[in-house]
């Protein structure tokens, strides 16, 4: 193994195809985010993968179709097992969470699993002792080279476009996992109230302050900028919904399904700057196992150029923190616990 790989075992980072393949052949336990051609070129081994081409690295944001972002779990996890989840079996992912550990779930973007996870899990949230994290795969939406979203079970060498795959990871007795969410957005308190009658990823008709409107027309009329999410409160949590540009003629595609009866407003425009994210991130934990970032925040973060970034990770079509999140940073943290906390 090359010297630079030895020094970075157990860490996240951007690697070439050959470096990633070498880690797989060495038996490392990996989560891989990469271009579809890169993923399908990797050998079988103990890894899961999802399509992604935008990443936050130590000194900025990059798009790469040649390199893979690798999260190495080998030195963190005591044992692991694979789970496969088509839409009709998705709720069983909660039943499969380890008693002490975490689960890392990858979902193909715009699949029925994506819609179902975003819509139903927000409503049926269950208390668990171990966290569920991960991301929704997808890349380059709205561009000429947009990719077909899929996830990969690298253990068996199988590609899935309509099912989620998960690694259920068990920790040692003296360790505990938790997740934290960095959300730079809040509701614009003075904004219009927007509601939708059904759960959907493609948004057409809505009600604005009780009046029926075409949502795409409303977004254009109010010159809503790319990167400004809808924000709503769901069971006490603030959830963002990323809107994809360019808009359709009479529809808008979202990266998380809207929920019926939830009152949405657009986030405050002054929260779109990178400094707002930095201010919120300062309060977050620095020692993390993995970080996932919202795809809709990439333009905002990339504009800031080469500045130190505390949380390397992929920009995904959705971040998982028990529920489906948009335009946040989700951190997976594993900590040692005191002896009196160990049962």
Residue ranges with predicted function:
Residues 1-343:
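Hydrophobic alpha/beta core scaffold segments
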């Amino acid at each position: 193994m090359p010297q630079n790989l030895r020094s970075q075992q157990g860490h996240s980072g951007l690697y070439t195809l050959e470096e990633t393949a070498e880690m797989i052949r060495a038996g490392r336990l990996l989560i891989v985010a990469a271009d579809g051609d890169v993923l399908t070129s990797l050998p079988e081994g103990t890894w899961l993968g999802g399509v992604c081409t935008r990443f936050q690295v130590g000194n900025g944001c990059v798009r790469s179709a040649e390199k893979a972002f690798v999260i190495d779990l080998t030195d963190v996890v005591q044992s692991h097992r694979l789970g496969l989840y088509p839409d009709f079996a998705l709720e069983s992912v909660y039943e499969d969470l380890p008693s002490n550990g975490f689960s890392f779930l990858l979902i193909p973007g715009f699949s029925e699993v994506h819609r179902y996870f975003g819509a139903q899990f927000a409503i049926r949230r269950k208390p668990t002792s171990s966290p569920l994290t991960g991301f929704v795969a997808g890349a380059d939406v709205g561009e000429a080279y947009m990719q077909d979203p899929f996830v990969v079970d690298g253990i068996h060498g199988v590609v899935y476009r309509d099912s989620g795959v998960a690694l259920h990871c068990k920790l040692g007795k003296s360790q505990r996992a938790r997740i934290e969410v960095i959300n730079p957005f809040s509701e614009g308190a003075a904004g219009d109230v927007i509601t939708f009658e059904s759960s959907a990823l493609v948004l057409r008709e809505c009600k604005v302050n009780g009046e029926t409107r075409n949502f795409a027309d409303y977004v254009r009329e109010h010159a809503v900028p790319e990167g400004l999410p809808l924000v709503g409160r769901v069971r006490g949590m603030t959830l963002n919904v990323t809107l994809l540009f360019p808009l359709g003629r009479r529809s808008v595609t979202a990266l998380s399904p809207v929920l019926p009866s939830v009152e949405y407003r657009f986030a405050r425009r002054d929260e779109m700057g990178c400094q707002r994210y930095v201010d919120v991130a300062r309060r977050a934990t620095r020692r993390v196992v993995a970080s996932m970032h919202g795809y809709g925040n990439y333009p905002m973060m990339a504009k800031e150029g080469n500045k130190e970034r505390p949380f390397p990770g992929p920009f995904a079509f959705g971040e998982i923190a028990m529920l489906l999140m948009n335009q946040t940073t989700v951190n997976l943290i594993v900590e040692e616990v005191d002896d009196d906390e160990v049962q």
